[in-house]
Structures are given as C-alpha cells and as structure tokens.
Amino acid sequence: MRGAYYVAIAFLVAASSRTAAEFDQAEPQPAINNDILTSGGTVNEMLPKRVLRGSRDLKDKLAVYANDEQRTFDLFPNENNFSKALNPTITKTANVMRADRDDVMAKAAEQ
C-alpha cells in the first residue's frame, strides 16, 4: 500500500510540473483596446459572452431565471413579522444544540 502511495505522489508531481511548464508565465499586459490583452507576444481577445454562455437548449432543467426565484423576504410584509417568525426557530435550535452538548459532555465524563 505504501508503494501505491508513492507512485500516486510521483504521478501528481509529474502532472503538476508538466502543467507548470506548459503555462505561459508572462504577465498579461493591457493593450490600447480594452477588449484585447497581450500575453507573451500573443493577442487574446476577451469574449465574455463565450466565457459565461448559458445553455441554448430550451429543455435544460438547470437554467434558472430571475422571475423563477423565490425570495425569503417577500414572504413577510415587513421586518417585524420576519423576526417574530425567526425567533422561535432560533430558540428551538439553540436549545437542541445545548442539550446535545450536555449529553456529549456527560458521556465523555463517564468514560
């Protein structure tokens, strides 16, 4: 098992050194046009539409639209109702955590 561990470490080191060797270490320099960056003598156009492009498939279940979101604060007309509804929940959670902590401490003391 120890040999497999050493082999795995060797593969990870080799992969990371290969990645570091392929990486262009020149700092990106801003060009005259804000949409173009130069890196090591090459010109790279920045296309934000391609970087953060969403799925064009209408059947995509992962697409989330702003009008589909449910806001927690919209459920309560004002802050007072929100805090009144939240206080019992916080109190109950704190009591459960306190009781569990006491049980754990009692069990540890018994051992």
Curated annotation (Swiss-Prot):
Keywords (A to Z) from UniProt: Glycoprotein, Host cytoplasm, Host nucleus, Secreted, Signal, Virulence
Position of the signal peptide: 1-21
GO cellular component: extracellular region; host cell cytoplasm; host cell nucleus
Subcellular localization: Secreted; Host nucleus; Host cytoplasm
Record keyword Lipid biosynthesis present: no
Family statement: Belongs to the RxLR effector family.
Protein's recorded name: Secreted RxLR effector protein 159
